[in-house]
């Protein structure tokens, strides 16, 4: 997912405020599910972030274009693990990694942890992150 950096994304120093990288990852995950046709309000279950490990490697600034890449690492009984990276494209299309995160999403139904059924697992495996 491609994102342009606007004033609202930056701090007083003109660089992207650190929590926005996590927001960009959330948008990319959500967009992948939406594009694949998943409607959580109709499915009866939803995912919540249960763990997040992040590494801030470099900064984006106003006007930059960044891209979020998402990769499914593991699909468990009641959760999934994703790796997400945010890249900045520079001169000659060189990629520079700005941010890396490993995110665990727990599957919930009615406010409680729930097993991911086989049809949902098949759906997740088909999502183009």
Residue ranges, per PLM feature:
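Hot-dog-fold acyl-thioester-processing enzymes
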Residues: 1-50, 108-129
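Generic preference for hydrophobic/aromatic residues in regular secondary structure cores
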Residues: 46, 65-66
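Short structured motifs
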Residues: 50-56, 67-69
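HotDog/MaoC-like acyl-thioester-processing domains
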Residues: 56, 61-62, 73-129
